[in-house]
Amino acid sequence: MGKQRVLSGVQPTGNLHLGNYLGAIRNWVEIQDQYDNFFCVVDLHAITVPHNPATLAADTYAIAALYLACGIDLKYSNIFVQSHVSAHSELAWFLNCITPLNWLQDMIQFKEKAVKQGENVGAGLLIYPVLMAADILLYQADKVPVGEDQKQHLELTRDIVNRFNHQFAKDKPVMKLPEPLIRKEGARVMSLTDGTRKMSKSDPSELSRINLLDPPDQIANKIKRCKTDPVKGLTFDDPERPECNNLLTLYMLLSGKKKEEVAAECQDMGWGQFKPLFTETAINALKPIQEKYQEITADKGYLESVLRDGREKAETVANQTLADVKAALGYSAPV
């Protein structure tokens, strides 16, 4: 029996930050030898909200380079660009046609983002979860690493699979039911300016996040200015001190220390002691990623070859799934 397959991806919108790394990519790296992995740069998702066409291609390559710099190993994993595999868009259309509108209108992320965009909200944002379902189902993924905020989208994917197989493939299901792969620690890294909100690329304040490619002086400045409280003695899990819990968690994850060690080390500290310690830890943790990124981006031909190989491998799997779906729907084969 072969390895189970994992599918995940990140949008090429803005810089990758500690939330992306600790909540997703580092987890991929740690488990990649256990699975057959398909890691995608989801650039089709990137245009569901206003984007900059002048930087989309460069941002896409930057994310792929960061995958490699963070430790994604091509011996175990396949890296490709979503828009380079046309089956994503085609399967998304077929799934859109069988997905009830009210399922999509109930998605929490759509409701939140639609409020921000008002009358300018696009249909792409509404059907975003169906495209995500297509991404997963094309590769017959067994496991999908998701944060708590994406669990609802994965549940929708499972509902779509069940609906499709029931209507069109009862005797021989053509798409697999994916399961979530959830990491509790680090799954939700919070903002440096508000410990109750998730660290996000879309936050207008650069001070809210530490980007993977931030130079040391920027990291130091962001930590120096991050939101804290006047209480001496730093503790985990106090609901009245969300920023304290977040900063201790970040320090724990970046230092590699156990929670008990950090709790004992920091229980009598003030912020004046902790912030320099956290700053040094963050800078040292990101230095090898930044050095590897510079090495990879210096050789564009290498990165292009990685994405070319990735596309070819992805197409082999995706096109077979797409052919099975089209046959189940009754489409004629190309002549």
UniProtKB/Swiss-Prot annotation:
It comes from the Bacteria. Its EC number is 6.1.1.2. It is found in: Cytoplasm. ATP binds at Q11, P12, T13, G19, N20, G147, E148, D149, V189, K198, M199, S200, K201, S202. The keyword Ligase applies. InterPro entries: aa-tRNA-synth_I_CS (IPR001412), aa-tRNA-synth_Ic (IPR002305), Rossmann-like_a/b/a_fold (IPR014729), Trp-tRNA-ligase (IPR002306), Trp-tRNA-ligase_bac-type (IPR024109), Trp-tRNA_synthetase (IPR050203). A motif ('HIGH' region) lies at residues 12-20. A motif ('KMSKS' region) lies at residues 198-202. Keywords: Aminoacyl-tRNA synthetase, ATP-binding, Cytoplasm, Ligase, Nucleotide-binding, Protein biosynthesis. CDD domains: TrpRS_core (cd00806). L-tryptophan binds at D135. GO terms for molecular function: ATP binding; tryptophan-tRNA ligase activity. GO terms for biological process: tryptophanyl-tRNA aminoacylation. The keyword Cytoplasm applies. One of its GO terms (cellular component) is cytoplasm. Its main location: cytoplasm. It is an enzyme of class 6 (ligase). It catalyses: tRNA(Trp) + L-tryptophan + ATP = L-tryptophyl-tRNA(Trp) + AMP + diphosphate + H(+). Belongs to the class-I aminoacyl-tRNA synthetase family. Homodimer. PANTHER family: TRYPTOPHAN--TRNA LIGASE, MITOCHONDRIAL. Catalyzes the attachment of tryptophan to tRNA(Trp). This is Tryptophan--tRNA ligase. It comes from Nostoc sp. (strain PCC 7120 / SAG 25.82 / UTEX 2576).
